[in-house]
Amino acid sequence: MLTRKQYELLRFINERLKEAGVPPSFDEMKDALDLRSKSGIHRLITALEERGFIRRLPNRARAIEVIKLPELSQAAGNRRGFTPSVIEGNLGKVRTSTPALEDGERPVAVPVMGRIAAGTPIEALQTRSHTISVPADMLGNGDHYALEVRGDSMVDAGILDGDMALIQRNETADTGDIVVALIDDEEATLKRFRRRGASIALEPANTAYEVRILPPNRVKIQGKLVGLYRKY
């Protein structure tokens, strides 16, 4: 399990490697994560290396190799149904101009309906509070709403505490989908959905949490996860 800062740094390093072919400097990492000193970056780098997500190459300056990402750390069979699409801050990158938007990039107002637990289930969904703007091509067809994620039980699927989960309204789900599940009409939780015989399994993406096995009459599907909205 990664902390939020560890995950943010790992994503930043991976994106910079893809864009520039070289990892960011420690100063760039410090600025991107809004840390006061480079010692914090050293600790994060060490933690990521100890957990097997990166490797520092000896005798080379700024030589960091990303070995895996949390979203990719599970077997493909355990990830069916969702690959995170994330709207996020630009991590310090500056755009010199603003290009014209294509139709699919034009924002759509998505209502925020409260909070959802990625941990111990919390109270049922609340009423609409405000809206966020999301590119239309990120959502696809159907009706959508957003929920603020609370907890870390889905961190290995790339879903962090504080993210906005973008949900497509749906009352059914396929095995492997990440869903909003309403338990006993009282508790709402964000988990991976699986069928186990005549029962339903709600699986976390964090080994610190247990799978919940419930009869179908206790679980109502409220929607499926289609993306994440993340601000830095």
UniProtKB/Swiss-Prot annotation:
EC supergroup of this enzyme: hydrolase
Catalytic activity: Hydrolysis of Ala-|-Gly bond in repressor LexA
EC number: 3.4.21.88
Protein origin, superkingdom: Bacteria
SUPFAM superfamilies (UniProt xref): LexA/Signal peptidase (SSF51306), Winged helix' DNA-binding domain (SSF46785)
NCBIfam families (alphabetical): lexA
Function per UniProt: Represses a number of genes involved in the response to DNA damage (SOS response), including recA and lexA. In the presence of single-stranded DNA, RecA interacts with LexA causing an autocatalytic cleavage which disrupts the DNA-binding part of LexA, leading to derepression of the SOS regulon and eventually DNA repair.
PANTHER family linked: LEXA REPRESSOR, LEXA REPRESSOR-RELATED
Family the entry assigns: Belongs to the peptidase S24 family.
UniProt protein name: LexA repressor
The organism of origin for this protein: Bradyrhizobium sp. (strain ORS 278)
Gene: lexA
